[in-house]
Amino acid sequence: MRVYQFCRPFQLFTYFLCYLLVFVKANKEKISQKNYQVCAGMYSKEDWKGKIDPFISFNLKKISGLSDESDPGLVVAIYDFQDFEHLGVQLPDEEMYYICDDYAIDIGICEEENRDEFIVQDVVYDPYTSTNRSLANPIMTFSQNEVGLHDTRYPIKETGFYCVTAFRSSTSTKFNAVVNFRNAYGQLAGTEINKLPLYGLLAVAYVVAMALYSFAFWKHKHELLPLQKYLLAFFVFLTAETIFVWAYYDLKNEKGDTAGIKVYMVFLSILTAGKVTFSFFLLLIIALGYGIVYPKLNKTLMRRCQMYGALTYAICIGFLIQSYLTDMEAPSPLILITLIPMALALIIFYYMIIRSMTKTVIYLKEQRQIVKLNMYKKLLYIIYASFLSVLAGSIVSSFIYVGMNTIDMIEKNWRSRFFVTDFWPTLVYFIVFVTIAFLWRPTDTSYMLAASQQLPTDPENVADFDLGDLQSFDDQDDASIITGERGIDEDDLNLNFTDDEEGHDNVNNHSQGHGPVSPSPTK
């Protein structure tokens, strides 16, 4: 039977399918009549040491719809991606013919001994280099119509990007199989193994940075701002989260993609949702002036910030749980039920941060508080630099592959793409957080800075300040620190951040009788 009609789109499709499949996340991949090709990066034992010799195996789990006992069922090819052009022969009518069957044998494009196998050409013309090209690595091809593990494994002698393709001999045939891309070092996919040492190093970096911050925290334990306590708690959380990420890759490399590993991944995603949400929350309260412009925020305002953060966290958790319950091979539009609210929640968070930061900077300019203003300017520079760094990583990676043909790009991209898409943003986040923590670290003057203003810059609004008032930070009601004697209706404070809610106008209004801030030690 002529089978090229089933294979006609193979050559063009291979380019795009393999590029999309370059990020195989597990070393065992399913293959079926719907998804008849899978690819993954593989390391040779020389490039990445391990206990076993790396290989690719094919295990047919289910097959049905065979016409008779002579039906070959599946025709399978295992090959290095750069050799895909060696599969099949172009007929005079410009159709590609891939399987060695009766018709192919009759017209002389393959031999009887290769019946029910892929047609393989040892030398082909390469249109990219305009030269003849030989096989880079052997191509293994066979047919199978019975359930079970194929006897022969494909050995990996060279590091590369390898593919497995399975064609049906009949459109009525249905099958399910598992392809095992087994590297020498363990169960992790080739695209993930570099994350294991990198996240280990990142965990060590977090521990060192946290130790340095903790030392400053302990040294000034009697002069701490609430914000600095938040930062230390988040430092501990981020350090633990990074260690958990490293442990995930280590366990997955040892155990494989088991049910326990999947549960662990859900747990890890919950931690990641907390990391994202609390990062936005910290930036929001800093943007509102917490800890530097004002020792504390109004209690109602702080509570509403916390409630909005908790709501965002719950939405992120819902999205993650739904994404794990959704079949990625058949995605459902129902995922939008949680995706859209999560996107909106983060956008609103970002808007509130930028708006609050802008108002705080304007207020500091009006009050001529140069030191605090410079701190907030540095924070803005850090945020902008982080965005530019992530963007620059994507641009640089794109330029690296400019000029490469499709085959070379796919062959090389799988080993480094993870760094730009996964690890680079994580590394930028680490640098940004450590920089912000260093900027707001406990010092001999940080407590006084939050409790005072640069009096000579605004002499008309100066009010007396007593060092004994420092103790009152812990004794006064949170709201009175911002609102002073006048007080303010808590219902006037909401997350729309009008002028009465951010505390800036509270200070300005009170300055009519007492200076630029309330009588409490916010001067």
UniProtKB/Swiss-Prot annotation:
Q: Which family does it belong to?
A: Belongs to the LU7TM family.
Q: Which residues lie on this side of the membrane: Lumenal?
A: 27-197, 252-265, 326-333, 403-417
* Top-level taxon of origin: Eukaryota
KW Transmembrane (keyword) present? yes
User: Where is the major localization of this protein?
Assistant: Golgi
Quote the subcellular location field of this record.
Answer: Golgi apparatus membrane; Early endosome membrane
> Which species does the entry assign this protein to?
Saccharomyces cerevisiae (strain YJM789) (Baker's yeast)
- Annotated region described as Disordered, given as residue ranges: 483-523
User: What lineage does UniProt assign to this protein's organism?
Assistant: Eukaryota, Fungi, Dikarya, Ascomycota, Saccharomycotina
The molecule here is called: Membrane protein PTM1
Q: Name one GO biological process term.
A: retrograde transport, endosome to Golgi
